[in-house]
Swiss-Prot record:
Similarity comment: Belongs to the CRISP family. Venom allergen 5-like subfamily.
Occurrences of domain SCP (ranges): 68-212
Cysteine pairings via disulfide bonds: C27-C40, C31-C124, C49-C117, C193-C210
Localization annotation: Secreted
SMART domains, per database record: SCP
The protein's name: Venom allergen 5
Tissue expression as described in the entry: Expressed by the venom gland.
UniProt keyword annotations, A-Z: Allergen, Disulfide bond, Secreted, Signal
Main localization of the protein described in the UniProt heading: secreted
Keyword Signal included in the entry's annotation: yes
Keyword Disulfide bond: yes
Amino acid sequence: MEISGLVYLIIIVTIIDLPYGKANNYCKIKCLKGGVHTACKYGSLKPNCGNKVVVSYGLTKQEKQDILKEHNDFRQKIARGLETRGNPGPQPPAKNMKNLVWNDELAYVAQVWANQCQYGHDTCRDVAKYQVGQNVALTGSTAAKYDDPVKLVKMWEDEVKDYNPKKKFSGNDFLKTGHYTQMVWANTKEVGCGSIKYIQEKWHKHYLVCNYGPSGNFMNEELYQTK
């Protein structure tokens, strides 16, 4: 669907401006990868999308619950040895896979990054208590509709089809399976996500960012302990 002429939009905000940006001095955080912290560089939840037309940003309470449930359902599927996909499959069961809990600070930093409408990983997103990992997903349609955030999470899960469980995590895993491995990294305890929907030319896009703490995807380490 082409967009022409004047467009009048009411931007729907579904996230409360959390106090973390004011309570924490992110400019003092030194990330292991270097760079200026995302919450320091951009400083607020105000979208900064250039000529893209922002439709809405943030996640509802229900969407947060759905995202968390999808993560934990998938982690428990792996833990029970019920995932048959892989290269080769199946994935072995895990004995140290715990459920994730939602973390509002991780969600705040993820939302700040999502609101830049820049697809890809930011450089510095760590918080005071740990290093932070990240998954990103972007979908688009020429129809005026936006994918449910759980559908974007499932895109990360689907990377399991390319994962070889017989070896430890390596740099070769990042491109094809890095989102999957972060989702099921056993030592990761918390997750928080941000979302923005916008129009770019004829495309209606939904961008989801999830931050994870402590971070996963460490070289030559196992995703989890097998039974």
